[in-house]
């Protein structure tokens, strides 16, 4: 598999100027920068067989700027192979854009790792057919394509079994800010789940704002035209020189650092800083060990010591506290909340609702909720699941939430046949002793009598569609569960 994650693509295009020596100079410059920043990087070439690519009547047409540019920088197959070897020798991935079918064959012959589809070729179906049969990972730009055209391309590559990534791109050279439309990156990510999305840029080489926004929007591949200027070579106004490339990557790395993790990370320094501003709980009068502490017994003041009960903790809904020691008047209280069933259930419900909101699973208010806890509510996070009952007639539909690390014990049904449809996350379902690894979008049929258990490492939400559900139709293979009253291992809620 290709490593598309945080891949920087240095597009050489024709900036080699028809010189292998200068092309290698560009490769070495990019290799040094990639090594400096320890990044996943590639150099991209362009292959065209100009003897057939350009119509014979136009080979001497000086008005067609692209034709004269291609002819003046032409390299033969052997010269391109030298560049490919130099790319690999510098620890970089070789990528190439073919503009005709013969060039696809040459890419395979040169053992280039990734094929890149140019925006202008993204609807060239004869070329796309050839590329899809090359057996190489593909990255495609989408400049100038409508969403429907991108849908067609993604569908084609998917059905061809091609490993691929999609790059947002604007085919204007250079691209002004107002044309970039980087919001579209988010739409591509939502529209094609599981597909790596990136950005191929042609903006001013000194414009570092664009890479920052692209990464913030979710791009994971970044492409720019690069070159090395000399006394006789001047780069075009959308190609980066090595100094600009260095600045570009530094900006990308800083952006990644600023973005951090998608999970909330509270550092010790942040917690300490906030604690210094909180109010602590202090005894208004002497309090004896074993007393239930009421609001009349305490007052709030700062500073609050490390581990001391805060005003927010004391005033939380249904929070109760019992003195674990004797307290003198004005002494700070160090206690933990007496957690009741309400607090445990609320935590479970809030976690499940958050998982569903993040997954985009929207439910109505007309439903019931079951907490299935086979060994008690205290062990819910280890064993069980949360079930949302939507309808139960001749057909039945439920939404089932499996928490990270949670296991649902093995059972089978005699009357009910069911189908699991994974909506979010991943699930390992064990069917009659065999593991099935399921991801988002997968469907699993469980027939009557099939023993099944499931678990999830990262958490999972799936839809269960079945025949009518009967409460006495779940048969557990663990005797300690089978002997329980079915309602003893359930907590029923009217709604979220």
Locations of regions flagged by a protein language model:
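Conserved short histidine dyad/triad with adjacent acidic residue
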Residues: 381-384, 396-414
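Double-stranded beta-helix
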Residues: 457-496
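A short, N-terminal "cap"/entry segment at the start of jelly-roll beta-barrel domains
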Residues: 341-396, 481-496
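Short acidic-glycine-tyrosine-enriched beta hairpin
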Residues: 433-451
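Glycine- and acidic-residue-biased ligand/ion/polar-headgroup-sensing regions
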Residues: 403-404, 414-432
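Catalytic cores and adjacent flexible loops of soluble metabolic enzymes
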Residues: 1-347
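Structural/interface elements that position substrates and couple domains in central-metabolism enzymes
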Residues: 6, 65-67, 374, 379, ...
């Amino acid at each position: 598999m290709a490593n598309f994650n945080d891949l920087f693509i240095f597009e050489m295009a024709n900036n080699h100027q028809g010189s292998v020596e200068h092309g290698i100079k560009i490769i070495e410059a990019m290799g040094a920068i990639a090594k400096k920043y320890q990044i996943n990087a590639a150099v991209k070439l362009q292959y065209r067989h100009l003897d057939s690519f350009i119509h014979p009547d136009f080979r001497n047409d000086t008005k067609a700027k692209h034709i004269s540019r291609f002819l003046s920088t032409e390299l033969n197959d052997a010269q391109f192979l030298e560049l490919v070897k130099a790319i690999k020798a510098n620890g970089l991935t070789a990528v190439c854009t073919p503009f005709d079918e013969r060039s696809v064959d040459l890419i395979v012959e040169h053992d280039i790792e990734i094929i890149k589809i140019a925006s202008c070729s993204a609807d060239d179906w004869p070329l796309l057919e050839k590329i899809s049969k090359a057996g190489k990972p593909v990255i495609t730009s989408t400049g100038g394509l409508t969403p429907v055209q991108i849908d067609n391309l993604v569908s084609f590559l998917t059905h061809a079994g091609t490993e691929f990534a999609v790059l947002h791109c604007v085919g204007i050279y250079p691209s002004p800010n107002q044309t970039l439309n980087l919001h579209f990156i988010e739409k591509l990510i939502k529209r094609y789940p599981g597909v790596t999305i990136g950005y191929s840029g042609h903006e001013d080489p000194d414009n570092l704002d664009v890479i920052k926004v692209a990464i913030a929007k979710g791009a994971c591949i970044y492409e720019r035209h690069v070159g090395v200027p000399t006394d006789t070579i001047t780069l075009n106004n959308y190609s980066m020189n090595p100094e600009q490339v260095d600045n570009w990557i530094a900006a990308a790395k800083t952006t990644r650092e600023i973005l951090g993790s998608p999970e909330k990370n509270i550092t010790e320094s942040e917690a300490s800083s906030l604690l210094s501003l909180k109010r602590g709980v202090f005894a208004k009068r002497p309090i004896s060990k074993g007393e239930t502490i009421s609001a009349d017994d305490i007052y709030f003041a700062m500073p609050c010591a490390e581990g001391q009960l805060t005003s927010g903790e004391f005033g939380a809904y249904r929070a109760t506290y019992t003195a674990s020691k004797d307290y003198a008047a004005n002494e700070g209280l160090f206690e933990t909340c007496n957690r009741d069933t309400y607090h445990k259930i609320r935590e479970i419900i809030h976690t499940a609702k958050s998982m569903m909101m993040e997954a985009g699973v929207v439910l109505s208010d007309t439903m019931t909720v079951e907490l299935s806890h086979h060994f008690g509510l205290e062990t819910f996070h280890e064993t069980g699941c949360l079930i949302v009952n939507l309808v139960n007639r001749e057909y039945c539909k439920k939404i089932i939430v499996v928490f990270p690390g949670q296991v649902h014990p093995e059972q089978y049904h005699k009357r009910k046949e069911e189908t699991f449809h994974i909506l979010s996350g991943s699930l390992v379902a064990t069917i009659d002793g065999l593991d099935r690894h399921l991801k988002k979008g997968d469907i699993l049929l469980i027939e009557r009598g099939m023993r099944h258990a499931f678990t999830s490492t990262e958490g999972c939400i799936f839809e269960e569609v079945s025949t009518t559900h009967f409460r006495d139709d779940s048969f557990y293979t663990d005797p300690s569960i089978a002997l329980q009253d079915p309602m003893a291992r359930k907590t029923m809620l009217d709604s979220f």
